[in-house]
């Protein structure tokens, strides 16, 4: 199953917090401050964009949902901790 990566630039704190909570409610996991990731394909990506369109201001904000094939996601390189796992001690991780 592919993965969905959602990243955003939202200027208003209230809208940004609401978007983060909404993405979490869709089953996505925060990997950086403005980046969420989870299993799902094109349908999940569209769901995330639809939800974002009800929250953000398209004149000043942007939200991108990217569908990544599973074999590409497994080759992801990570330096530093993943925000959803702040106790992670590994500096470099190959998924």
From Swiss-Prot:
InterPro entries named among the record's database cross-references: CRISPR_associated_Cas2, Virulence_VapD/CRISPR_Cas2
Signal sequence region: none
Pfam families in the record: CRISPR_Cas2
Binding site for Mg(2+): 9
Keywords: Antiviral defense, Endonuclease, Hydrolase, Magnesium, Metal-binding, Nuclease
EC assignment: 3.1.-.-
SUPFAM superfamilies cross-referenced by the UniProt entry: TTP0101/SSO1404-like
Domain of life: Archaea
Gene Ontology terms describing biological process: defense response to virus; maintenance of CRISPR repeat elements
GO molecular function, one term: metal ion binding
Required co-factors: Mg(2+)
Enzyme class: hydrolase
Subunit architecture: Homodimer, forms a heterotetramer with a Cas1 homodimer.
Role description: CRISPR (clustered regularly interspaced short palindromic repeat), is an adaptive immune system that provides protection against mobile genetic elements (viruses, transposable elements and conjugative plasmids). CRISPR clusters contain sequences complementary to antecedent mobile elements and target invading nucleic acids. CRISPR clusters are transcribed and processed into CRISPR RNA (crRNA). Functions as a ssRNA-specific endoribonuclease. Involved in the integration of spacer DNA into the CRISPR cassette.
Annotated NCBIfam families: cas2
Entry similarity comment: Belongs to the CRISPR-associated endoribonuclease Cas2 protein family.
Listed name of the protein: CRISPR-associated endoribonuclease Cas2
Highest classification ranks of the organism: Archaea, Thermoproteota, Thermoprotei, Desulfurococcales, Pyrodictiaceae
Gene that encodes it: cas2
